[in-house]
């Protein structure tokens, strides 16, 4: 069975998910998942929704997930030495040196990601995940590429593990550069030709080889394998990343966030259409003139603003819709639905009041962030870990970073759920310290709280590396000793000055005492000028 036939067979199981994704896309971002699969998208056929709430919440949630998964100012992972190997094979004293080297490697990896188009493609994939629930990312040599749900099919086992992926894309004949049949020579039953004669359909088949345990993929065009298109990759570092937003046991495809709240979106769409059309009808001004009136309709039509015409007021009337109460009911319901949708997509709505404290805004924001926990769990497993493994493999193969021993070094994800956990730890720690300071006073806080341990825990909660930033206990003790020595020397100099002013140190009466005092002053000054020993 060739790739085209395999794609068509697996597409039957995708149809129900694709239809639901198209419905969700039509209410939010219609251009994400279009109705036409065989030709290039024609945006003239896209229907614009009557409301923009769906588009707003999708874009906002995608931006939040983007910043949480790949934060721009920090790393989303940490390279750490396995604790069970640290005591056996590595000297614990070199732990700080390893952390410093790992931090340099982490910055190199983040610089590589920042210089690429990864964030742009990942943001696009997140919008597909929120709307359609599925997305496919290919990590190629030239960067990342996103496949929407109508361009790929996937086959999974009962546990959700990927067994097979088949993609379909339109590629220009000039780009392929192969000896392809001319337009019109293909068979009428051959679906590899598209409506555009310059484009051909190329299928990519991705399978997991059971014998070698590696991913194998190749491309076909006109049911023939394209020469040089066969490639392989390790099982844990595949460039093909099929992503899901929500999973259901036994289903090959995921469910999107929009599908969970599509009822409110459909209701808001209907109410918005009714309000817009009703408001347009109510805004239309039509005058009625009594047939027995002496005032002619032409007189009213031709009268300018502020003009004076002859007539009786009761002969002229204005048509009124009289649906103000009905419009108010629909508008109130639309506002309630919009508020529910904003809460569902984690869009913060601050209470409209004269006095809204910063603490209330902070608690609202923290409550919204806690709702991201379930979303992060699946994205961490299906996206961040495979994405990091593939990036490490690419950089190690190109010798941009040194090869890391897998049995000693283990990368760990610190973004997503872990970042939310650290944020809660920071919040609890600051509240605990603040409560002690307010109830018992600053003196009790300094007496019972260990400052160095509190600083370390705050830095760990915020994901800050304290290496060479926070002073160690040895450095603090050394500085205290230096301060004590300087204080003692200063006291000795002051005492010597007081003794020098006494009558017993008069050179005319006691010459030997003056010489001894001079030697003590010189010795104290030399000790004070000596640099501190490290």
Predicted regions and their residues:
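C-terminal anchoring/interaction modules
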Residues: 1-20, 24, 288-534
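An N-terminal domain-start capping segment
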Residues: 29-56, 112-113, 182-213, 299-321
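Long, contiguous amphipathic alpha-helices that act as assembly "spine/axial" helices in icosahedral shell
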Residues: 55-58, 62-63, 100-142, 253-288, ...
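Structured, contiguous alpha/beta core segments that scaffold functional sites
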Residues: 8, 139-302
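Short, mixed-charge, low-aromatic patches
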Residues: 57-68, 76-84, 94-95, 220-226, ...
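Extended, helix-rich architectural segments
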Residues: 1-183
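Flexible coil/linker segments and helix-coil junctions enriched in charged and small residues
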Residues: 87-91, 181-192, 436-440
């Amino acid at each position: 069975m060739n790739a085209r036939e395999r794609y068509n067979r697996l597409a039957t199981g995708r149809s129900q998910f694709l239809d639901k994704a198209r419905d969700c896309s039509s209410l939010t971002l219609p251009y994400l998942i279009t109705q036409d699969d065989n030709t290039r998208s024609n945006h003239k056929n896209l229907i614009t929704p009557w409301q923009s709430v769906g588009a707003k919440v999708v874009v906002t949630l995608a931006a939040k997930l983007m910043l949480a998964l790949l934060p721009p100012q920090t790393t989303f992972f940490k390279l750490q030495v396995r604790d069970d190997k640290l005591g056996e094979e590595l000297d614990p004293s070199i732990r700080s040196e390893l952390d410093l080297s790992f931090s340099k490697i982490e910055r190199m990896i983040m610089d590589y990601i920042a210089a690429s188009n990864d964030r742009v493609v990942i943001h696009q994939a997140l919008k597909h995940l929120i709307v359609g629930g599925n997305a496919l990312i290919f990590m190629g040599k030239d960067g990342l590429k996103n496949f929407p749900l109508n361009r790929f099919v996937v086959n999974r086992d009962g546990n959700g593990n990927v067994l097979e992926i088949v993609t379909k894309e339109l590629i220009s004949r000039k780009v392929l550069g192969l000896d392809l049949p001319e337009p019109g020579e293909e068979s009428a039953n051959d679906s590899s030709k598209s409506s555009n004669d310059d484009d051909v359909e190329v299928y990519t088949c991705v399978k997991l080889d059971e014998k070698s345990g590696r991913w194998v993929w190749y491309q076909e065009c006109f049911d023939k394998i394209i020469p040089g298109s066969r490639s392989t990759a390790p099982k844990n570092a595949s460039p093909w990343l099929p992503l899901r937003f929500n999973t259901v046991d036994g289903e090959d495809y995921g469910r999107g966030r929009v599908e969970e709240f599509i009822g409110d979106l459909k209701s808001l769409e209907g109410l918005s259409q009714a309000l817009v059309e009703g408001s347009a009808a109510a805004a239309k001004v039509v005058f009625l003139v009594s047939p027995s009136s002496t005032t002619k309709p032409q007189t009213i039509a031709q009268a300018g603003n502020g003009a004076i015409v002859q007539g009786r007021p009761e002969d002229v009337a204005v048509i009124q819709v009289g649906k103000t109460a009905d419009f108010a009911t629909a508008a109130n319901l639309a506002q309630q639905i919009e508020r529910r949708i904003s809460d569902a997509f984690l869009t913060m709505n601050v209470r409209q009041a004269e006095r809204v404290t910063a603490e209330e805004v902070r608690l609202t924001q923290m409550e919204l962030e806690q709702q991201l926990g379930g979303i992060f769990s699946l994205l961490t497993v299906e996206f961040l870990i495979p994405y990091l493994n593939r990036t490490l493999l690419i950089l190690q193969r190109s010798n941009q970073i040194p090869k890391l021993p897998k049995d000693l070094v283990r990368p760990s994800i610190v973004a997503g759920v872990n970042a939310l956990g650290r944020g809660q730890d920071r919040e609890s720690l600051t509240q605990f310290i603040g409560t002690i300071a307010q109830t018992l006073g600053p003196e009790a806080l300094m007496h019972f709280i260990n400052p160095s341990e509190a600083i370390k825990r705050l830095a760990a909660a915020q994901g800050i590396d304290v290496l060479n930033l926070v002073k160690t206990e040895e450095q603090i003790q050394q500085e205290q000793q230096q301060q004590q020595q300087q204080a003692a020397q200063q006291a000795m100099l002051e005492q010597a000055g007081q003794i020098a002013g006494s009558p017993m140190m008069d050179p005319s009466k006691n010459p030997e005492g003056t010489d001894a005092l001079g030697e003590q002053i010189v010795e104290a000054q030399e000790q004070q000028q000596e640099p501190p020993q490290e």
